[in-house]
Amino acid sequence: MKYIGAHVSASGGVFNAPINATQIGAKAFALFTKNQRQWSAKALDNKTIDLWFKELEKSKIEPKHILPHDSYLINLGHPDSDAREKSIESFLDEVQRCEILALDRLNFHPGSHLRKISEEECLDNIAESMNRVIDKTSGVKLVIENTAGQGSNLGYKFEHLAYIIDKIEDKSRVGVCIDTCHMFTAGYDIRTREAYDKTWNEFEKIVGFKYLSGMHINDSKPELGSRVDRHDSLGCGKIGWDAFEFIMNDKRMNDIPLVLETIDESIWAEEIKTLYNFIK
């Protein structure tokens, strides 16, 4: 079974996210549990928490089909130790918010070396930061998102994801989220059956499907291998519809949140419907 949704607004309170998801016919969703462009936020109050559980129950969407996303400011691989500590503190708060909301995974971008340290040193920093947060929390899987490799962002190679996972002490607390736009602009082709199979076979060999904990379903404005992160509406970009039809009929993507982050939210309901119609 496929669980498709979108990254919906939680403006006015996290409890609005399940309401917004239901309105577009979603069976999954992503959200920010706090303002994604600020370091700190006030704690979730009891009223907000109660409303969250009430609306979540009404939506009939299970926690395992929800993929919260952390703040864009966090860089667990930061070359400067003080800046990294600030990121770890903020990331810990995000994981604790997930615990409070009974969410079992948190999606994040791995980090950036800012051209000040090597890729390996940065990946080591990311893994160490994750291990520290895992030690202080329970029940929330840290889901590493692959990146387009724009600037000095790491995570654009399957090998980066595998390297981090290898250094995580409790493997039950780590997963990956594959963003189709990022994958494509990082150089992994999925446009034809042959290319799709080749890319995912490589993923299985290097990372492993047992770690796949969610996907971001996006078309791409830039070309294959451009290392530029710009999403497009499905079928409008350089990836095209075939890849999304392959995903919808790939059992390896069952029972995880498949989340749209496409650029025109006014057609999300339509995109969700189209994806479900692809299922044979």
Curated annotation (Swiss-Prot):
EC assignment: 3.1.21.2
Highest taxon of source: Bacteria
Biological-process GO terms, alphabetical: base-excision repair
Residues binding Zn(2+) 3, per UniProt: 182, 229, 231
Keywords, alphabetical: DNA damage, DNA repair, Endonuclease, Hydrolase, Metal-binding, Nuclease, Zinc
Cofactor note: Binds 3 Zn(2+) ions.
Residues binding Zn(2+) 2, per UniProt: 145, 179, 216, 261
InterPro entries: AP_endonuc_2 (IPR001719), AP_endonuc_F2_Zn_BS (IPR018246), Xyl_isomerase-like_sf (IPR036237), Xyl_isomerase-like_TIM-brl (IPR013022)
Positions contributing to Zn(2+) 1 binding: 69, 109, 145
Any one Gene Ontology molecular-function term assigned to this protein's record: DNA-(apurinic or apyrimidinic site) endonuclease activity
Swiss-Prot/TrEMBL catalytic activity: Endonucleolytic cleavage to 5'-phosphooligonucleotide end-products
SUPFAM superfamilies, A to Z: Xylose isomerase-like
UniProt xrefs under Pfam families: AP_endonuc_2
Cofactor(s) it depends on: Zn(2+)
NCBIfam families tied to this protein: nfo, PRK01060.1-4
Family to which the UniProt record says this protein belongs: Belongs to the AP endonuclease 2 family.
Task of the protein: Endonuclease IV plays a role in DNA repair. It cleaves phosphodiester bonds at apurinic or apyrimidinic (AP) sites, generating a 3'-hydroxyl group and a 5'-terminal sugar phosphate.
Protein's name in the database: Probable endonuclease 4
Species: Aliarcobacter butzleri (strain RM4018)
Underlying gene: nfo
